[in-house]
Amino acid sequence: MLKPLGDRVVLKVEEKEQKVGGFVIAGNGQAATKTAEVVAVGQGIRTLNGELVSLSVKEGEKVLVENHAGVEVKDGDEAYLLVSEANILAVVE
């Protein structure tokens, strides 16, 4: 399993199949954002005083992330997205 460092977050992106006029559009088409599940979070970042500030998101939460953010990584057969917490726009409740 991947263990992110600092303010990074490992996400499992939800692939949604979209249809337009009977044709299937691969991936998210032209969407500006995508929905993902938080799989793992880093320990946080340190302030100038050395205090550790933990991340705002937790494992298991669904989040909205910028479409072109992060780096795609593989762990075995599974594909994940590694992003900085700043690229996460909202928690989906």
Curated annotation (Swiss-Prot):
Q: Which domain of life is it from?
A: Bacteria
Methyltransferase among the record's keywords?
Answer: no
Kindly give the SMART domains that the UniProt entry links to this protein: Cpn10
Q: Which family does it belong to?
A: Belongs to the GroES chaperonin family.
HAMAP family reported for this sequence: CH10
| Subunit (UniProt) | Heptamer of 7 subunits arranged in a ring. Interacts with the chaperonin GroEL.
| Protein's recorded name | Co-chaperonin GroES
Which source organism does the UniProt entry give?
Streptococcus sanguinis
Gene behind this protein: groES
